[in-house]
Amino acid sequence: MTNWINTVSRDHVEAGVRGRFTQANHGKPHMLRKMARGDWIVFYSPKTVYPDGEPLQAFTAIGQVADDEPYRAEMTPDFQPWRRKVDFLDCTQTPIRPLIDQLDFIEDKARWGYKFRFGVFKIDDHDLEVIRSAMTDS
């Protein structure tokens, strides 16, 4: 299994949790195709609302990929984003700042936000456990 972080505004994460899905990179399929059933995905939200919401800088959801392939959804006739089904855990929104020193994927602690510019990226099991334990009771 692989562990992922998906950088998404909180309003979009909330829509995904309600609908049990994720999108990535504005609906493009490339990174979703790299995911497999059972992979963990953590959602980091730099803002409350896309594109001009208030700064949030928190992990806002966590779950596991629950299908085998991306699928298309019709939002409007001109926008049919690719998605993956996700089984979300019950969790608590968790600010990132108290966790920065424990997270190995953040190599430069002074410029901790840089990695999130990639949108979707892999993390190791240690980092997943740091985040998951902060967000859940387990």
Curated annotation (Swiss-Prot):
Transmembrane segments: none annotated. This is UPF0310 protein MAV_1800. It comes from Mycobacterium avium (strain 104). It comes from the Bacteria. Belongs to the UPF0310 family. InterPro entries: EVE_domain, PUA-like_sf, UPF0310.
